[in-house]
Amino acid sequence: MKKQNIKYLKDYETDMITAVFHSYTRQIPTATLMEIDRIYTEETGKSLRTNYTCSSCILKLMRSVGKLYFKENIDCLPDDLKDKFKNA
């Protein structure tokens, strides 16, 4: 991942942890979701076609970008979640 994307996503680590490991998200502003969606598309070359008013679409986006983020930043995870992520 590009450094500026990692830096932006760092502020949303908690949201990505809850999405990836607990399958829920809290309310995230639409402008933030749009930027996270842009980052996902930039990093993967794929579009999730996210509807920002659809809770399952938002969860899918946060899980997808979270998995990308944690692959490169596994050290930011608590130890018990590191094992879960490595074994997933």
What are these regions (language model features)?
Residues M1, D11, P29, D37, ...:
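Acidic metal-coordinating catalytic centers involved in nucleic-acid phosphodiester chemistry
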